[in-house]
Structure formats: C-alpha cells, structure tokens
Amino acid sequence: MSQSKDKKKFVGGGGGGGGNNSGGGGYGSPKHNNNNNNRNSSNNKSPHQSHHNQQHHQQQQQQQQQQQQQQQQPFDSLTAMKERTVFMSMSLVGQNVSVTLKNGDVYEGILHTTSTSTGSSGGGWGVALKMARKKDTNNRVITTLPLPLVIIEAKDFLQITATGVVLDHYRDSFMNRDQQSFITDTELSGFDGNLKERELTPWTPDPSVGESLDDFAANSEAKKPANWDQFETNEKLFGVRTTYEEEIYTTRLDRDSEFYKINQSVAEKKAQEIENEKSGNIHLLEERGFVEGADYDEEERYSSVVRKGLLPTSTTSTTTSPPTQNPTPSSSVYIPPSKRNNNNNTPSTPSVTSPPIVDKKHQQTHQDKKQTQQQQQQQQQQQQQQQQQQQQQQQQQQQQQTQPTTTATATASTSTSTTTTTNESPSSSSTSSTPSTPSTPKNITTTTATTSTNNTPTATNTNVNSPLGDRESPTISKLRLHQSTIDQDVMGSPRENLSPRSVAYTRYRQILSEPTNKSMNKSGSNISTTPVNGSGNVGPNGTPLLSSVHSDQAPKSPVPTIVSNHGLVKALSLELATPTVPEKFVNDFNNFKLKINNVDRGSETQGLKSFSSNLVIKSKSRPGSPLIGSGSPRPTPTQLSLSGSSTSTNTSTTSPPTTNTTTTTTTATNSTTPSTTEDDKSTTTPITTTILTENKSDDKEKEKEKEKEKVDEKEKEKEKEKSDEKDKDQSSTLVEKKDESSSSSNTTTTTTNTTNNNNNNTTTVTKLSKLKLNPNAKEFVPVVVNKPQPSFKSTTESNTDSVTPINEIYYDSMRKRQLQPESPDQVSLYWVDPFYPRYEEDPYAAAYQMRAHHHMVGHQPPPQLQFNPQFYSQQGHPQLQPHHHMVPPQLQQVPPGVNVHTMKPPGSLQPGGGGVVQPQGIVQPQGIVQPQGGVVQPSAGGAPKTMYQQQQQQQQQTGQPGGPMGVQRGGHLPPQQQPQQQQQQPPPQFIQGIPPGANLVISNGPPNQPFVFQGAHPPYAVPHPQYPMPPQGIQGGNKRFYQPPPQGYPQVQPMIIPQQGQVVSQNSPQQDSPSNRLNQQVPPYSYMTHPPRGYHPNENQYH
C-alpha cells in the first residue's frame, strides 16, 4: 500500500512551499521530486539541452492530463443502458414477441430489428416486426391476415414481451455444478493438457432396414422373374406389339460365317484368361465376383489412402528394383499382372481357377516356354541381388565418410535359398543406376526367402535442416527450391498445405495425441517425444518409428519437453507469422506504381473517342451506300453471299489478267441444238445460268473447256440472229443488255449445256450476280425505256445496284478527277460565300469584297476590269494592289507629290453648305476628264444627285433611271479615259476642294492611271459621308441611302487597273495573316467584278 501512496498525485492548494517533497496542500511523489531537481539543474545546462528537456517535459504533462481527463469522466448511465438494450435486442432477433403501445394496442410478430437512440432531444427504442398482427382479446379465432412489416417508433413504444425463449444453450457445465464443491485448476481451465483425437468408428447399417429395391414393391411375395422381357410385358398388359429390330441400331452380324466363328473362339479364350488372372486390385476382384462387399468395408475399398500392407517409405530414389513378393489386395503399389507371383505360400485373396480351353499341342509348347522363362528369371534375379549388395556397401561407406551425423542404415539379412528376393520397398542409390528387369511369370513356382524383422530401406535423407528430418516426404523435399525462398515460417502462404511448417504442425499434434514415454530404449521399441536435432522422433538407427510398441505405463503429458524446444513451440503456434519481404521487391513495386501513375493516357483516350465516333458514323450509314476508305464497314468473307443461286460450284478463269470470276449467260430458246461429245451423246438446250469459275489444275479439263467455249460461241452467234427476228420477253432483253455491257467491259460469256436423259426439257434459271459488299442489297434491274417505271413500295428489300462492282464506281470517280484537276492555287467554288455581309459604313469597300455577286434578272453586270501585270514593272514602280480603283472626289484635282496635310480649306462639305475655296497654285493632274454637262440636282430625299448628259440620254431611251446597266445609285467605277487631252471646265455648281483632316500623301504615279495611296488607309483618313434617309416608296427604310458618285460612268472602255500587288500600310496586317481578306480570297492574275454600291430593293436577300 505504501507504493500506491507514493505514486498518488494531488493537484490543489495555493501554498508556495519550496521543499523537495512538499506542495501547496497536496502530496508529492518521487517522480515530481525528480522533475523538480531536473528543472533546477536545467539552469546549469546549455540552452539547447534545456530546450530539449522542456519539450520532453511538456509532452509528459500532456499525456498525464489526458489520462486524468479519461479517469475523471463520469459514468454515463444512458450509455450503459443502451448497451444492455442492444445486447438484449440482438439476442431476441427472430423470436416471437408482443409489443405494447402507449395507447394500449398490442402487436404480435417476429422481431426483425430494433433501433436505439440516446441524446439530448430524447431517446427511445423502436421495433420492427415481421408477419405482425394486432392482438384481439375478444376473439380467440384469428380472422385477419398478418402484415408483412410493422415499424413501431420510439415515441409509441411502451413495452416488449418475449415468451418461450430457450436459454439452455447458454448454460455451461459449471452452472450445474455445486458451488460449494472444490474445483481444480484443470477443471477451471477446461483443458487437461492431453490433446486427443476422436476415435473413428465404422458406420454399420441397421439390419432391420432393408436396402434392396425389391422391398419397395407393393407385394413383397411377388418377385420379379429372372429373365424379364419388357416387350412381352407390354404386349400382355397393354396389347402393344413392338417393332424393335436390333439390326436398325447395330450392324448385322453373320453368325454362320467362318470369320465370326474364329473370332468368337479367340475372344472366349482371352476372356477366360483375363477372368482367371489373380489381381491384387480390390476393385477388379469385386467386379469379377471374387470378393464380396461384406469382406471389406467402404474405407478399405474406396479410400484414397491404403493403410494396410508394407511400411510406407519416403525416399527420393533414382533406381528401383521390381518387387517379387505377392502383393496384398490392400497394397498401394500397382504391379502389372506379368510381374506378379501367383503361387505364394501365403494366399492373398480367394480365387477361382479353371483350366484354360487349349489344345494339347498348344499346351505343350506353352509349358516349354514357361520353363525357359523360369530359368532366365532365376539368373537375372541372382545378378540383381549381387549388384544391390554391392551398391548397399558402397552407400554405407560414403555415408560414413561424408555424413557422420546421419543415422546408419541397416541392410536386410536374408537366408540362403535357391531363389533370393529383395525388399519390397524400393532402394535408392545416388551414384549408379541399374535397369529393372521383369520378374517371373504368374505360373512359375518359386521359393521365397524370409527377411528379418529389421526390414528397412537403404536410403537416407541428406537434408538435415528440415523440420522433420528423415521423416520428410518426397513431395515436401521437392518444394525446397532454395533455402532463402522457402516459406516454412509463413502461415497462409500459397504452399501452406504442403509447406514444411504445416506438415510439422500436424506431425507434432499426432505425437502429442499418442500415449508416449520419455525414456527411449536402445532397441527402439518405444517412442520418445524428445526431438533429435529438431528432426522429429527417430530411432537409434535413423529409421522412422511409424509402427511402434506402446508401453503399458500411464500416459504423461509431453508439454515440458515441447516448451523446452523453441522449434516445436513455433510449429504449434496458430498465429499468422508476418512474412519478411526483401527491400528489393518493395522498391521494384513502388517504381512500378510510379510508372503506372505517370503513364500518359491521352493517346488511349483519343483512340477511344475516335473509335466511338467511327462507330456512330458506321451505324448511321445506309445499307445501300457503300463507304470507300479505311473506315468503310467491310464484311467478313463469311458474310459475302450471292443474290442468285448457282447450279455449279466448279469454276475456271478465262481471263486471268482482268478478273477471276466470269459471268456466263445465254438466252433460252424453244429450239434444241443437238451436240455430240465423247462422254455422253445427248441433246442439249441452252439455258440462262450463272457460274463462278475457279482455276483447275488438270490440263485435260482445260482442253475440254476450250472446246466447249468454241461450240458455245457458235451457238451464241446463231442465237443472236434468231433473237433479232423474234420478240422476246422482258427477261431476255435484260440479259442481252447485260451481255452487251459485259462484252464492253472485257468480260467473257460462256454457256453451259445440261444433258436431258429423260427427254424432258428442264431448264434452271438463275439470276445474274456478282460479289458485293452489302449482303442485304437487292439486285439492280435497269428500267425499260418504253415501259412505265415501277413505283417504290415499302418493302424490306433495298434498291441497290449489286451488279456494278464498287471498284468500277470508284475508278470512274477517280478518272473524272484526273481529267478535271483542280489547281492548288485556286480556291474551290464551294468556299465562296456570296451572302457575306458587306461593309456598309465604308464607301470604298467595294475593292475589299471580291466575291461573286448575284445580279437580278434583267440587269447586266458591270464590265470586267482588265489587268496588265507588266505595266507597273515597265514604269519602275512596284506592283501594288490599290485599296480602291478610283481617287476620292475631293482629291481628283490635286497634282501628285503635293502634301495634302498642309492645306487648310475653309468651309464644309455638307450637302447644300458653303463652298470650298481651292488653294492657289494647284494644277489639275493630266488624264482626269471631267464629265460634260454635269448638273447637280436635288433628289427626292434631299441628297444631291448629279446627272450627266450620257446618263440622261440613256434614261430617256430605256425609260429606266440610270441607263440599261441599272447603276444609278452607286457604281464606284473610275471615269473612262478619252483620247482627247483637252481639259474641260467643271460645271458652275460643281465645287472642288480638299476634305479636312485628309492627311494623305499622294505618290508620283504614272499619268492616266489611278492614284496609289501610301499613307494611312483611306477609310480612316477620309471622313465618312453622311447619308440621308431613302426616298419614299423604297422598301427597307432602315437601310442607308448611298450618295451617287460625282463623276460619270465609263463610256467606251473601262480603265486598266493592276491587281497583282497590294497596298500595305504601316499598321495593316501582313499579307499571309488570316485577317487579310484580300490576300486570301483574291488569287493573283484574276479578274474582279465589282457590284454596285447603291441601295437595292432586294437587299434583304443578300445581307
């Protein structure tokens, strides 16, 4: 008790005493004393050491506080009650219970499950009953069906009652014992220390119960006859006479023939010889009737282990000598009949002998052969015995030299006799091997020698490290592949059933179950439980003591001897041993996992996606539309079928370079043409057939075919002449067309002749067909010109051309592509989008839109602009592509080379506004021709409209505004170059000027050519014009009304405009960029057509 007082801790008090074992009102322990000393001594240590001690001390304090909190937690009564109710409910599952509710109702049923809940909100016990029924106290008879499931919640539950619960299986033998009696330690532990196996007793049937099938008959006195005929019985009982004949199901035997009689006599002789043989197999004896079932029990007859006979040995021998003793019926070694000694002093099994049926001559020669075989057998046995004795002596010498610790083997001492025999157990030799020779036949009588009691094998097991030593079986020794990889210490391994550990465990359990004695005599008559070098129980001479003489002494527990040996205790352990895995395997496995995790599965995922997409495409393809390419659904060779049935399968190739199949067709006629052949002279009728030919190897057949082809060609010519004169049916016309098409496609046509032996003209008509990709396709039938086309009906057959091969269709399409190739620099027409929205805000955007324009019916498109690629190269200027083909109207009078940015024109350019003063010193450029008679007239919408003489004349002639070209509004075309060089004055109302903020630099271009801007882009430099509202009567009021150009239309020839180059400003995109629409859509050396920029009434169709 003092020890517990010293360890007691008390936390409290506020006193400040400084003693070693004192505290503020509490006890102090030696542990605290040491802590205080360490805390005081920490001042003399280094800062690092003191810091380490403080951390360690803090960890100890945290652990102590956690333990105190766990000890100070109060006992929860609700938790304990919940545990008791859960245990009780689990014990009552499946019992018939009655549950009382708070309202007084009672439900009876089988308890299925319960739910217990505890908490601040309230706890309770819910019940679920199966096959429940509400209890009615008034009626004793049940009148209602049970409910399959009733759930009673905790708020309604009041009481549960279980009746008829059996608790006997929870009782133990100690509950029936008187509590006042004395109980020993062995009885308390329930184990007396002796491991005993249950003794097995054979099952014997009850003699009162009959096992015969005859006992089940209704009348036991009426026995079935020995020769019962089912046919005779059916005829008597039911009047049914059988028609059974054995010859229907088997081959008829001629029992009167000599062959049958000879074979029957030979078979009877062989059967008698086989039946008269003495066999050591109990199953054969039972089948032949030599052994009855009562002589042996089922364990001996049908068990896989034969427990009787000689001692089993476990030797890994390489040389075996044939046994000469007569094997017993329970022997586990199979011996052929030719190597058995039937005449033995000790009869093995009862046998029935009968003399064979042989002739005297045959019997005499048979006896002579047996005598010679007997002499040879004796000589061979003597030689074998001498060789075995020599081998045994050599083995003993080698074992004494190499393995002094192994047990010595004893050779069997045999008595002298005319014929000596070896041990039945096989002997082994590791140095030499001798072939085994057959022993004496069955009818030779020999005198056998008796062996001594010490009949043991001569082989020893060299593996001393095994847990069983010499007792180890050969199957276990084969498992020892390598000493480091053996899994004898691993329970639960794949080789657990055959591992040395499990074998040692079962062996030691068997040793403990047998009555043993500690002492071991020198003669080896008793068993000692003390192991020898951890190799089990072995005798002094190293032999396994499987059959030993037990002593009459009382059995004693071998536990002390087992506990003293660590190997035996380890073998008896039932715990799973942890396997030791080398570090190399662990690292390899971790590297493998890293490789698996780092694998890029993008390609695999993409492959799956492409596969699924291809699968969807294939599934949506129509059955009559073959797909060409790698993704086409090609059928397997087994799916290729013929739409027509052919009368012959023998085929030959008449045109090898073209195709391997030839279609042979002939027209059927009413007249018959006689033709004589060498094989058969008969009349032949030409019929319509289809034959698929193959290659034939015989030369004779080829010659015959050539002759037939010549005859067929002549017949074909005659038939054509007759077919021109007579009218034919629709089928004949179709065949002729097919013949013409086939002759044009280098296909050979032949006819087949069918012989008519019965003088009956029988014709078999088959359909024309070829191999096709779609087996479900319907044969194509061409439409007759003079007859109405058949209407398509909803049928399961498809209308697909199966006659024309798919290769011809593919080659025709490829041939057309080769004849009309597409240039690589030209964009296909289907890439041109004529309905692309135009730049409405840009008045000079006509040059950027290079797509074809769909003009209205009755309007003529503007003339195409010619292109001269050598013009600029001759003038010394780079070939550039202008942004617009005309100069803005405000800059037409500015000479080249003048900086427009320095000019400051007063006034504005608003319609109807003030004039613009032209700067002094500006000379108009040459080649700019002003329109004659131009007058600015206000339009209906208020916008200025310039009308010229030529335009007015065209309007008066055609009666349409804008002339026959219909370009009144828009038409940004340059003025026509006229041969006259005289400059005309502009009309008085035509005001010239420079727009403010133009900021353009005009290059020195050639005369009579449009200007090329090198500064900023015109749409950004020139201000956008202001468009007024459209005039009344025009649809699309929200559309802009474009201003007419201030210059006239071309009169004779359009102006030549270079279109090879392209003006690129400093801030414009590169020529190869995708945003450069001009470079992408306008190929070089091509013409451009510009649509009118005016408002069009059908503009909604194009925008």
Swiss-Prot record:
<feature type="compositionally biased region" description="Low complexity">
    <location>
        <begin position="683"/>
        <end position="694"/>
    </location>
</feature>
<dbReference type="Pfam" id="PF14438">
    <property type="entry name" value="SM-ATX"/>
</dbReference>
<feature type="domain" description="Sm">
    <location>
        <begin position="84"/>
        <end position="166"/>
    </location>
</feature>
<feature type="compositionally biased region" description="Low complexity">
    <location>
        <begin position="637"/>
        <end position="676"/>
    </location>
</feature>
<protein>
    <recommendedName>
        <fullName>Ataxin-2 homolog</fullName>
    </recommendedName>
</protein>
<feature type="region of interest" description="Disordered">
    <location>
        <begin position="930"/>
        <end position="1103"/>
    </location>
</feature>
<dbReference type="InterPro" id="IPR025852">
    <property type="entry name" value="SM_dom_ATX"/>
</dbReference>
<dbReference type="InterPro" id="IPR009604">
    <property type="entry name" value="LsmAD_domain"/>
</dbReference>
<dbReference type="GO" id="GO:0010494">
    <property type="term" value="C:cytoplasmic stress granule"/>
</dbReference>
<feature type="coiled-coil region">
    <location>
        <begin position="366"/>
        <end position="403"/>
    </location>
</feature>
<feature type="compositionally biased region" description="Gly residues">
    <location>
        <begin position="960"/>
        <end position="969"/>
    </location>
</feature>
<feature type="region of interest" description="Disordered">
    <location>
        <begin position="615"/>
        <end position="763"/>
    </location>
</feature>
<feature type="coiled-coil region">
    <location>
        <begin position="691"/>
        <end position="730"/>
    </location>
</feature>
<feature type="compositionally biased region" description="Basic and acidic residues">
    <location>
        <begin position="358"/>
        <end position="371"/>
    </location>
</feature>
<feature type="region of interest" description="Disordered">
    <location>
        <begin position="1"/>
        <end position="75"/>
    </location>
</feature>
<feature type="compositionally biased region" description="Polar residues">
    <location>
        <begin position="516"/>
        <end position="529"/>
    </location>
</feature>
<dbReference type="Pfam" id="PF07145">
    <property type="entry name" value="PAM2"/>
</dbReference>
<dbReference type="InterPro" id="IPR047575">
    <property type="entry name" value="Sm"/>
</dbReference>
<feature type="compositionally biased region" description="Gly residues">
    <location>
        <begin position="11"/>
        <end position="28"/>
    </location>
</feature>
<keyword id="KW-0175">Coiled coil</keyword>
<feature type="compositionally biased region" description="Low complexity">
    <location>
        <begin position="312"/>
        <end position="356"/>
    </location>
</feature>
<feature type="compositionally biased region" description="Low complexity">
    <location>
        <begin position="372"/>
        <end position="463"/>
    </location>
</feature>
<feature type="coiled-coil region">
    <location>
        <begin position="258"/>
        <end position="287"/>
    </location>
</feature>
<feature type="compositionally biased region" description="Low complexity">
    <location>
        <begin position="33"/>
        <end position="44"/>
    </location>
</feature>
<dbReference type="InterPro" id="IPR045117">
    <property type="entry name" value="ATXN2-like"/>
</dbReference>
<dbReference type="GO" id="GO:0003729">
    <property type="term" value="F:mRNA binding"/>
</dbReference>
<feature type="compositionally biased region" description="Low complexity">
    <location>
        <begin position="1062"/>
        <end position="1076"/>
    </location>
</feature>
<feature type="compositionally biased region" description="Pro residues">
    <location>
        <begin position="1020"/>
        <end position="1031"/>
    </location>
</feature>
<dbReference type="InterPro" id="IPR009818">
    <property type="entry name" value="PAM2_motif"/>
</dbReference>
<dbReference type="Pfam" id="PF06741">
    <property type="entry name" value="LsmAD"/>
</dbReference>
<feature type="region of interest" description="Disordered">
    <location>
        <begin position="305"/>
        <end position="474"/>
    </location>
</feature>
<feature type="compositionally biased region" description="Low complexity">
    <location>
        <begin position="930"/>
        <end position="957"/>
    </location>
</feature>
<feature type="compositionally biased region" description="Low complexity">
    <location>
        <begin position="530"/>
        <end position="544"/>
    </location>
</feature>
<feature type="compositionally biased region" description="Basic and acidic residues">
    <location>
        <begin position="695"/>
        <end position="741"/>
    </location>
</feature>
<comment type="similarity">
    <text>Belongs to the ataxin-2 family.</text>
</comment>
<dbReference type="GO" id="GO:0034063">
    <property type="term" value="P:stress granule assembly"/>
</dbReference>
<feature type="compositionally biased region" description="Basic residues">
    <location>
        <begin position="1"/>
        <end position="10"/>
    </location>
</feature>
<feature type="compositionally biased region" description="Low complexity">
    <location>
        <begin position="56"/>
        <end position="73"/>
    </location>
</feature>
<feature type="compositionally biased region" description="Low complexity">
    <location>
        <begin position="742"/>
        <end position="763"/>
    </location>
</feature>
<feature type="compositionally biased region" description="Low complexity">
    <location>
        <begin position="974"/>
        <end position="984"/>
    </location>
</feature>
<feature type="region of interest" description="Disordered">
    <location>
        <begin position="901"/>
        <end position="920"/>
    </location>
</feature>
<feature type="region of interest" description="Disordered">
    <location>
        <begin position="516"/>
        <end position="557"/>
    </location>
</feature>
